[in-house]
Amino acid sequence: MKPSARRLYLRSRGLPGALAALLGTAAAAAWAARWLVSLPDFDHTARLPVVILGPLLAAGAIGTSLHTPSDELDRTAVRPWWPRRLAHLLAPTALAVALLALAVPGHAEAFGAPAAVRNTLGLVGVTAAAATLVGARLSWLPPTFYVGVVYLAAPSDAGGGAVWWGWATRPGPEDGAWAVAALCLAAGTALYAWRGARHVSGEA
């Protein structure tokens, strides 16, 4: 892809705005993590809201950039679109992972960088899958609904299968939570690379 065509592609998908949103999200997450830990009677476990909401906002920013201005042109293109879709999804995801890992350093055994990385990967996968079903502009809704439910309902221990259905609220090192997040990322990425985002009337 030529540089001019690459710039046009990035602008048409709104990627500059999405990248700016990722930087802002990471900065806010870093500030919130330090503030929560500094409060009296709080410790590093108080960072749970940060390792959930930070990845959720990052996934939403990435998801809204997955729209296509013209799905008809995409379908009739000479070259397959799946490599570009794959790069489009994974490049900002890698950036989000790096930024949010830096935002919550230390205490890997609880709600530190591993939990932030896992939640970013898993929620990006959920968002990518949602983009293929409801469109990129609304792709933030399903992961937001999921996060809201599990944040309120998931127990503090892993009983009752919470490590599976409440994976986003689990401490960083738990293998079961990582397995679910990896499955979400793999399924969402494959679905988006194959189908692309659903075109919804009014998207440009």
Predicted features by range, described:
Residues 1-47, 145-146, 157, 163-204:
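Hydrophobic alpha-helical transmembrane segments
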Residues 34, 40-68, 89-144:
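Secretory targeting signals
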Residues 62-77, 81:
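Transmembrane helix boundary and interhelical loop/hinge segments in multi-pass membrane proteins
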Residues 79-90:
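Juxtamembrane helix-loop boundaries in multi-pass membrane proteins
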Residues 84, 140-141, 197:
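Secondary-structure transition/capping residues
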Residues 85-87, 96, 153-155:
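A generic membrane alpha-helix/interface feature
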Residues 136-158:
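Juxtamembrane non-transmembrane "cap" segments at the membrane-aqueous interface
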